[in-house]
């Protein structure tokens, strides 16, 4: 039987507190299971302890962000659905994931999530 989309677990990786917390609250109100991390290192700890279906991550973060974070995701988590959010991306670096440019509407992000899950 197909899993209800809202049963999937979403990990938000965002270093800006206001964005991370309001996005978490928005998705939880919509019925999603949400985990949060403020940087790539925190995300790795969460990923070691939890089964995550979708990762929504900022590109530019002060701790394990940018190109190295993208390389890590591509190398070790290519089986996950990953959405990159950013106001700035390195144009010389190929990003193999869906990209949602900031600022974005939270409902637009939810549409991205549903598409990634094949809904």
Where on the chain are the PLM-derived regions?
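Active-site residues of response regulator receiver
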Residues: 58
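Non-catalytic signal-transmission and effector/linker regions of two-component phosphorelay proteins
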Residues: 1-9, 105-119
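Two-component/phosphorelay signaling modules centered on CheY-like receiver
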Residues: 16-35
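Receiver (REC) domain active-site loop signature in two-component systems and cognate sites
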Residues: 61
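Short amphipathic alpha-helix used as the core "switch/output" element in two-component signaling
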Residues: 45, 67-78
């Amino acid at each position: 039987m197909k899993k209800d989309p809202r049963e999937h677990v979403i990990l938000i990786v965002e270093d800006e507190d206001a964005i991370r917390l309001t996005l978490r609250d928005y998705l939880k109100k919509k019925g999603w299971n949400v985990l949060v991390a403020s940087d790539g290192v925190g995300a790795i700890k969460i990923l070691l302890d939890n089964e995550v279906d979708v990762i929504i991550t900022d590109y530019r973060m002060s701790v394990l962000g940018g190109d190295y974070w993208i390389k890590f995701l591509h190398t070790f988590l290519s089986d996950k659905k990953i959405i990159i959010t950013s106001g700035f991306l390195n144009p010389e670096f190929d990003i193999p994931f869906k990209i949602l440019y900031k600022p974005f509407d939270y409902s637009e992000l939810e549409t991205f999530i549903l598409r990634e899950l094949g809904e």
